[in-house]
Amino acid sequence: MGNIRETNIKRTAFSLIENYGEVFTKDFETNKALVTKYTTIESKIIRNRVAGYVTRKVARMKVY
């Protein structure tokens, strides 16, 4: 069973991928810095969850 993400995390991640999809990579640390750059998220926990979700989606998109 996988982890279920909150709607606001998914919404933010999809918005970032839609607007800045070409800059995100499969590397979590890089994506974490990019999420900080492109959003106003102050919470470290939420930022990491968004970055992790973006990393997962980008990795799956580039496989196909």
From Swiss-Prot:
| GO BP terms, alphabetized | translation
Domain of life of the organism encoding this protein? Archaea
Q: Does the keyword Transferase apply?
A: no
Keyword Iron among UniProt keywords = no
Which is an annotated GO molecular function term of this record?
Answer: structural constituent of ribosome
Under the heading InterPro entries, the entry gives: Ribosomal_eS17, Ribosomal_eS17_CS, Ribosomal_eS17_sf
- Cite a GO CC annotation: ribosome
For this UniProt record, the keywords arranged alphabetically read as follows: Ribonucleoprotein, Ribosomal protein
The UniProt similarity line reads:
Belongs to the eukaryotic ribosomal protein eS17 family.
Q: Which HAMAP family match?
A: Ribosomal_eS17
What's this protein's name? Small ribosomal subunit protein eS17
